[in-house]
Amino acid sequence: HIGKKLYICAFKSLVMTALKNRKSTREFSTKELSLKDLSDLCWAANGINRPESGKRTAPSAMNKQDIKVYVCTADGSYLYNPQKNTLEPVSSGDVRPLKAPVCLILVSDTSSDWGAMDAGIVSQNISLFCAGTGMATVPRGSMDKAALKKALKLTGDQTPFLNHPVGYFK
């Protein structure tokens, strides 16, 4: 196949359309996410898609599943519980690194060599979900990790790896 011309797909599948539409944005509408959109976003990020085995939408190295997804809003921060598909309150106050209706913080244990890779996989799920549903996001490494670690009540080697402000396009 060396030297053969490759053809661009016709974007007939939902996945191909999401890939075509994926872009980063840092400007968001002030419109809040609906509960359904927030629920779907969390599930797409790292939810359980095979209840019989507990396996997730995002693969992870050696199936460690150590990425924790925190949801930060203007009112407070919550930990996503994939087993129950619920948000558990962590703290009050606004700690969003970039002002969007919601900011997802991807946390892993730095004692694992795989945390950054696993965070990247979850990040891609978030980006593709947003592109496929017409929502806006940008994966970011820039954040005050020490302040987030304190606000999210992280322990030991847990640290924020990436954050995803999410909202609707402005």
Please annotate each region the language model reported.
Residues 22, 41, 69, 102-104, ...:
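Small-aliphatic-rich amphipathic alpha-helix that forms the alpha element of a beta-alpha
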